[in-house]
């Protein structure tokens, strides 16, 4: 029995695919994060950040959680705030879906809609800057700061990555995940490079995002993308970087719902395409884990709305053969992601990143140096 809903975070299932996997190809497995109580992988990092802040004294009873998020992380914090008795203030933007707004507010959180775009045409920097300003002005406020706080990736290093290896006995040949704030991909890739060095790590982004460099353009796929390479992600830990078009990401997610009975968001559809690409190249002795970060129920008004899909010029048909053909034609954006960094120096100063974030990052840097001097077996038990 769990004493609170928060005790049910983690230990999500690893699912094989009944119809997509073929005996002559590598096996694709989905790490299905929809089973977290807040409905996404973001529950893990949100809880870790909040509980670390409580332990450090950065967040005290009756305090306020303030975060910039257009979706899952805001929902997770709203749930955690309700369970722990904190006021929660989430900064969103006009692209935030009605479903996500309803979930955030359903947990009792307050919402501020930021309408000013930043220098890249998105809302990330303006949302973050305002969240940091409010955190300074509101007494007892704490900013989890998923974009710049390296505790985000540490949460996945300590939980998600370990679960994957425990649930996947034998060889793990590849791991595929989407990238935005870099927490899940950053933490899991760092762990796997030590404890499953044979695994190829693939990062997946949207066409139009510049995390892996390239030309910035508008994109529709939620849950991916930034206009810079996030601090949480070390690109040299990746073996491949892929950029997937909006239409392909949406069509793939619809196909898995209709033909495998697995609901997922578009960013997870993009990851599944990359996993399938690898499976087609390899034989049956190989195993690929692809992250499904949330469920598709958050995208009923877009992903599963034929009228909306047609308004975007997207196909509404989604057969498994279509998906297999899309995957077959994919090519990596880069086979040397470490050379693709789009680092924007001075962002921490420009956006006035909170002192608690800087302290957490400094402490984690020291801990990483100590961890690096220990044997892998000893460090694994840390």
What function would you assign to each model-found segment?
Residues 1-382:
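PLP-dependent amino-acid enzyme catalytic core
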